[in-house]
Each structure stands twice: as C-alpha cells, then as structure tokens.
C-alpha cells in the first residue's frame, strides 16, 4: 500500500490489515504510517520494499506526480513488482494520468486496474467507499482484487476497461465540488444579508431540495469547522482535472472553469483545511 499515511490511505490500509490481508505500508512521511503497525502492517522504508514480491500494489496518493514518484522514481515500486502482479491505482489522477500509469504497467507486464473511490475520511474509516473499478475482465485477476474492494467499500461498480473509473470519478467530482462551492456562496450571501445561515437548512428540510451532502458541508461552514476530511488543495487539484477533461472533450463549461479557478484561489490560503473552507473565500469581510 503506497500512500498509507494520508487521510484516505491510512484508513484504507488499516481496514485491509484488520481484514486479514498481509499489508506492507509505505508513506513518504514514514511517521504518518507507523500507527499501522498496531494493526499488524509492516511499515516499509521505500516503495520498492513495500512492493517486492507483492501480488497486489495499491496506490492512494495525492496526485499524478506523487504516484509517478512512488512507482517509477528512485526506489520505485514498479521495478520490484513481478510480471503478472497487479497494480491497483485508486488515486484521483485524471484521464491523462491514468493513461500514463497504464502504459507504465504494460511496459513492466503488470496488470493495471483503475479504481478511484467516491468518499472522504469517514466513509474510508467505515468501509463505506464506493469503488469505481475498471480494468482487465480476466476473472482470475478480478477474483484477486474483489476481496480487497470488499474490505474497503460498500459498493463496487465494474465499469469496463481501465480509464472508465477515472472518467466517472471526474463527472462525480464535478457534482460534489459544485455542491460545496454553491453551499459556500449561498451561506456567504445569507450572512451578508443579515440572515442566520441555519435558516437555509430549516427552509429546505423535508423537501426535494434538501441535499444531505449540502447540509453536511454547509453546517460545517456555519460552525467554522474545517477539520480536513478532504483537503481544499486536493479539491482544487480535482477541479482542474475536471476542467481539463471538459476541454479535451471539446466542451465549453464555464461553470466548471470558474469552479476550478475559485477553488485554486481558496487553496492558496486554506489548502490544508477541509474543502468546505472554500467558504472563507466568499465570506463577508468583517471590519
């Protein structure tokens, strides 16, 4: 497991170890992965050490640069993997990034699965992620990764060849990030108009307009509680991937372009906070 010290990766590695898998965990900041030893995981010093002889190598890292460094950089995992083993790539790295990883896997005769997830810290801890799985249809390979997915998530969607998972993840991220930014702006507007922002949720309660996720993030904004479940810096990265895919598809989607710019602006000051901290970019300025 590469990326075992992040918010998502640590929870996922712990659940795999608790489910009886032999987990070798690596993280760039080793100290963040050390706690996994309490669940029986071996904490490796390099990606290559974690991957050596493994049937499956799972990557859950911040971005394509981190994935490339862990897999193909100094002491990278890919050179230590046996031909016929499996690379389970679960980071959100977009279409182009997924294509690059698939090419690297093919070069080393490693089976490649593209399986990003829908969910943040709490679903990861509770094994309630939605797995957007795509990759080889070979039953022997899928039989190896299916139990891993079942230890991590509540729902597994098989979507076709590698790349399909990342494409659906981009579409779903477009929805999630739009909801969060919309929540931030309507709360800021309510406050600027002298209203108690809780009235928004009181008015929506019980109607078809009452989105649970909007309520979850919106109430965090009203409490000014920005403990990270998913960092704003990563939300900005994902929004840029969405915008890039829209442009590659020849679409003019100004809302998503503006969303990407807005989240990038917020991440400059509040990148380590939860993505709901995008509210701080819009919040009325106090004298």
Regions found by a protein language model. Name each.
Residues 1-59, 85, 90, 121-124, ...:
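NAD(P)+-binding Rossmann beta1-loop-alpha1 motif at the extreme N-terminus of oxidoreductases
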Residues 23, 43, 111-113, 156, ...:
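Hydrophobic beta-strand scaffold residues
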Residues 47-52, 56, 64-130:
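Rossmann-like NAD(P)(H) cofactor-binding subdomain of soluble oxidoreductases
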Residues 93-174:
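Rossmann-fold dinucleotide-binding core
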Residues 164-278, 282-285:
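Helical "substrate-binding/catalytic lid" subdomain
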